């Protein structure tokens, strides 16, 4: 059974373009089979290297499911059914439901942090930013997100890439979403086949530039202890339908990448 879903009804609601570090990312709100969803394409560099964001989004959501973390579910749909969404050498788009209700507002962490530092007169720094995030989200949710990002090698958790849900004047942490820059989505074929290059994919945001440093901010366990070999096998089995859509070279690299990064999960178990 193919993991690519075929919807019956599609209606464009609002087209959007987002500027990323890799250029413009095409996305839009749609009614798909009477559900309001966000549809996203993939990116391309000036050098013409296309990203694999839709595949990474879906695999990351499946991994979050295995880890029992709050997350938004993503699916793949054929790109040709969404002609308003630009894709580059990619036959699929990622699709996820709107996860807020009409009486909820979503605020970027970046905007809240700017307002906080402006009101307090405190200078912004990576340390101050991290402490504010701990106050805002609490350790458990924040640490789980950082551990998850480290495991999947998410390069793009910038300050506009996680939010706060406000409902009736109260703050709530959102489910984890927007993981397109993970799981070697931006690795070239050359980087996939070179083991040393592949394992260098450890860029992090927003508190440190490398996951090896950012994971050290976690000072208490946030994941249950489990057998890492069994966990790895369950994860690979769960994402295997998506891996089957990729070249064997890329699928193998992702499997090895995740095995290598298990130590990040182990560091947060207890």
Walk through the language-model features, giving the residues of each.
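ATP-dependent phospho-/nucleotidyl transfer catalytic cores
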Residues: 95-146, 237, 264-265
